[in-house]
Structure formats: C-alpha cells, structure tokens
C-alpha cells in the first residue's frame, strides 16, 4: 500500500481554504468605507453628548444628539446605496462561494468513497485469506478452529527457538497434519 494514511471524511483539507474573517473584514472595509465612517461619527457624537451631559451643557447635548441622528442617517444611506451598488458583485461572490462549497463537498465525498473502497478491498482480501485457510483445513481434515489453535501453537513453537524458513499458511497447515 502507499505511504499516505487513509483519507478520512473528517479531515479538513487546507486546499479549499477560503478567506478568513480578518481578510473578509478588510475586503468589506475597502468595498464600503462609508459605513464604518458613519458608525465612527455616530459613536463620536454619542461620546460628545455623554460628555456634555456630565458637564451640564444642554445646548451642546442637544446639538450632539442631532449630529448622532445625522450620522445614523448617513450610515443608513451608505448601507442602502452600497447594497444597490454591489448587488451584482455580491450575487457573483455568493455563486462562487456556493460553487466552492459544492466542490469541497464533492471532494470530501470522493475521499470518503475512496476510503470505503480501500477498506472494502482489505476486507475482501482478508476474507479470501481466511477462506483459503478454511479450504486447506478441510482438505487436511481439520476443523477451522483447530487450524487457528494449531497456528497459535506453531507460533509459540517458533518463539521457543525453532528456526524455520519462511513458512506460509498452507505449509503450516500441512506441517500440522503431518505431525498428527
């Protein structure tokens, strides 16, 4: 088999890495710089209104509340105009993200199927080996359980110091039959 580990459907594949949240934030700030500007203006107006309220300056307080309303209106207009302006680009980006997600899910599905095929092949190989041992045992007149006991005994015999050349499963079964 290959040196690579079996693929798993739970693996995350860095090949399909999209933009992280910071890159997305930077991109959105470049696309619509007026929205953060409006948010900053609103926050500044609220902060100044708070300072005016603490100082007891009601004229400045009222003026800052009006500026806050203007800044919020500016932010709202920036959101609406930006939404209209970037509508087609957002639709294209959404379609691209959908295609990337579909490609990623297809790749995961393919990896999962490959993993299942490999495991299925290993299972078939094991069953074939097991069937060959059973056939050899039937030919020799032994029960399959006796074969496994005999093989376990032979491996114990090998550990005790019996030096034998490469003995296959069939040879081991034949040797067991000859010994009886």
Curated annotation (Swiss-Prot):
Region (Disordered): 135-165
GO biological process: mitochondrial respirasome assembly
Coiled-coil regions, chain positions: 84-111
Residue ranges annotated for the HIG1 domain, each copy included: 6-97
Any one GO CC term of the record: mitochondrial membrane
Localization in the cell: Mitochondrion membrane
Function (record text): Cytochrome c oxidase subunit which plays a role in assembly of respiratory supercomplexes.
Quaternary structure, from the entry: Associates with the respiratory chain complex III/complex IV supercomplex.
Family affiliation: Belongs to the RCF1 family.
Protein name, UniProt field: Respiratory supercomplex factor 1, mitochondrial
Organism: Coccidioides posadasii (strain C735)
Gene behind the chain: RCF1
């Amino acid at each position: 088999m290959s040196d690579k580990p079996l693929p798993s459907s739970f693996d995350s594949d860095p090949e399909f890495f999209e933009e992280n949240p910071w890159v997305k934030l930077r991109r959105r700030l470049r696309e619509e710089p007026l929205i953060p500007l409006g948010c900053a203006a609103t926050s500044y107006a609220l902060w100044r209104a708070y300072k005016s309220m603490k100082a007891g300056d009601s004229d400045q307080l009222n003026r800052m509340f009006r500026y806050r309303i203007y800044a919020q209106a500016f932010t709202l207009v920036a959101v609406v105009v930006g939404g209209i302006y970037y509508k087609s680009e957002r639709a294209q980006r959404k379609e691209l993200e959908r295609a990337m997600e579909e490609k990623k899910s297809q790749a995961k599905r393919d990896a999962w199927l490959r993993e299942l095929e490999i495991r299925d092949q290993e299972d078939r190989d094991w069953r074939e080996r097991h069937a060959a041992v059973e056939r050899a045992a039937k030919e020799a007149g032994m029960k399959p359980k006796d074969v496994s006991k005999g093989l376990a005994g032979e491996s114990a015999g090998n550990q005790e110091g019996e030096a034998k050349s490469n003995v296959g499963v069939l040879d081991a079964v034949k040797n067991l039959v000859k010994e009886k």
